[in-house]
From Swiss-Prot, chain B:
Organism field: Haloferax volcanii (strain ATCC 29605 / DSM 3757 / JCM 8879 / NBRC 14742 / NCIMB 2012 / VKM B-1768 / DS2)
Gene name linked to the record: tbp2
The protein's name in its UniProt record: TATA-box-binding protein 2
Repeat positions for Sequence: 10-86, 101-179
Family: Belongs to the TBP family.
Gene Ontology biological process terms, A to Z: DNA-templated transcription initiation
Amino acid sequence: RLRKWQERIRTKDAGERNLQFALSEIDRMASALGVPRSVREVASVIYRRALNEDLIRGRSIEGVATSALYAACRQEGIPRSLDEVAEVSRVPQKEIGRTYRYISQELGLELKPVDPKQFVPRFASALDLSEEVQAKATEIIDVSAEQGLLSGKSPTGFAAAAIYAASLLCNEKKTQREVADVAQVTEVTIRNRYQEQIEAMGFR
Amino acid sequence: MSGPADSIEIQNVVASTGIGQELDLEALADDLPGADFNPDNFPGLVYRTQDPKAAALIFRSGKIVCTGAKSIDDVHDALGIIFDKLRELKIPVDDEPEITVQNIVSSADLGHNLNLNALAIGLGLEDVEYEPEQFPGLVYRMDEPKVVILLFGSGKIVITGGKRTDDAETAVEEIVERIDALGLLG
DNA sequence: ACGTTACTTTTCAAAGC
DNA sequence: GCTTTAAAAAGTAACGT
């Protein structure tokens, strides 16, 4: 009986330690990503729910913690790309994506597809672009999405192209390379999306 | 009436069978020209047929997986060729080994562009996986027939997971109906 | 800025780690 | 869970020229 008692304490302690580790990892990654405290709290709640529903079995703590943070950013409307999240995590991007899909499904998060417009303020400020460029980029995204150009396209690439186009239209030109670097997409992707968006806007 | 169902093309058929006899894959690798066998990598020996084009994974237990064929007939033809090759090598093969179709992959065209964002919400986020950052297709799991459908912005689709030839047809009719009911079919 | 090649997703069996 | 095999869809990426 004493052994059972000790094992319970050991298990409880191990569980506590794992939880503490996960929460501190969420905190560390959130800081590195520069997301507000409210998002870390949402991520913590998602992690605890995954823990309570036994979704961590067979998965790494770090993987679930990272996915919880990725999901929290989306839920709070300030998404980070999987690339960005993977940069501050020690879990490979592929595993983060797979784990995210799993916990999202099991917890019924039902998150809508990421809206490219949600990347505009962050990318634009990283490029020192004005409020005017941001408004223009947002308009370009709305118009081209309405014309059906968004289906299947990566939200970051779509946002990057719109920002590039808007910077040209507002005489605050940034090079494709500069925009590509902050959005972490290639210049080829920006070029391809840019061409379609310009046509959708009726320019040419 | 030409509809999306008429555009269905089988792209790949996966089937399993067995010759009812254990095999020495090392010896078989030497006797079968073109056979690939890397036991450190994978326990199966890979053998490809040219006509019909297919690939077979042959295991020590005598069980065989055939994949890459474009029709169920092609699966039978390809496996027939393999059975004959084994018999030529004096390996006893059951007279008519049972062949089980495990998966059929088909493609089709709905004929209209699709708004995948609207479709994700319309079909129900709980049954849909749509992460364009990772893959351009929307993944929809259908219960009856039990298949998985990948839908693309172009209106082209992939139906996989079915075991019967008509699963794809039933699935296409069903998905068209659901998309149409949402008013999302051009 | 081309073209080519290759990777992402889904499905399924096989034997073994 | 992974390893291998095949195939489609469309987007993105990384090569070399």
